[in-house]
């Protein structure tokens, strides 16, 4: 299988998000990379579903809460920027203060 670097990145994010979801199901708090992956995957999948940018920016801030991440992680993440493919092209989506 020949994948572009961008496709490899998307695959890694998707896999990390799957790991994060399993850890949340077990009650394990997420670390920084897991939290970023989960939020990023939410945005990428939402874009593929055709959800608008503004909706993803707002909804992305409600994917995970402070109680679901390790101490200090919420303070480390001010913005998450994801380049996602929408039906009308690729756009940069910024989720401000994603862990509340």
Curated annotation (Swiss-Prot):
Single GO biological process annotation from the record: urea catabolic process
Reaction equations catalysed: urea + 2 H2O + H(+) = hydrogencarbonate + 2 NH4(+)
Predominant place of localization: cytoplasm
Database matches in SUPFAM superfamilies: Urease, gamma-subunit
A GO molecular-function descriptor: nickel cation binding
Cellular location(s): Cytoplasm
Keyword Cytoplasm in annotation: yes
Enzyme Commission no: 3.5.1.5
Keywords, comma-separated and alphabetical: Cytoplasm, Hydrolase
InterPro entries xref list: Urease_gamma (IPR012010), Urease_gamma/gamma-beta_su (IPR002026), Urease_gamma_sf (IPR036463), Urease_subunit (IPR050069)
Record GO cellular component, one term: cytoplasm
Pathway in which the depicted protein is active: Nitrogen metabolism; urea degradation; CO(2) and NH(3) from urea (urease route): step 1/1
Pfam families: Urease_gamma
Record's subunit section: Heterotrimer of UreA (gamma), UreB (beta) and UreC (alpha) subunits. Three heterotrimers associate to form the active enzyme.
The family this protein is said to belong to: Belongs to the urease gamma subunit family.
NCBIfam families: PRK13241.1, urease_gam
Full protein name: Urease subunit gamma
Organism (species): Rhizobium leguminosarum bv. viciae
Organism lineage string: Bacteria, Pseudomonadati, Pseudomonadota, Alphaproteobacteria, Hyphomicrobiales
């Amino acid at each position: 299988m020949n994948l572009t670097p961008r496709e490899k990145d998307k695959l890694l994010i998707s896999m990390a998000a799957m790991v994060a979801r399993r850890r949340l199901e077990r009650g394990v708090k997420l670390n920084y990379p897991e939290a970023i992956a989960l939020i990023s995957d939410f945005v990428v999948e939402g874009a593929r579903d055709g959800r608008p940018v503004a909706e993803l920016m707002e909804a992305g801030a409600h994917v995970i809460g402070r109680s679901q991440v390790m101490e200090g992680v919420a303070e480390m993440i001010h913005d998450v920027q994801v380049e996602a493919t929408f039906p009308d092209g690729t756009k940069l989506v910024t989720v401000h203060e994603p862990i509340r």
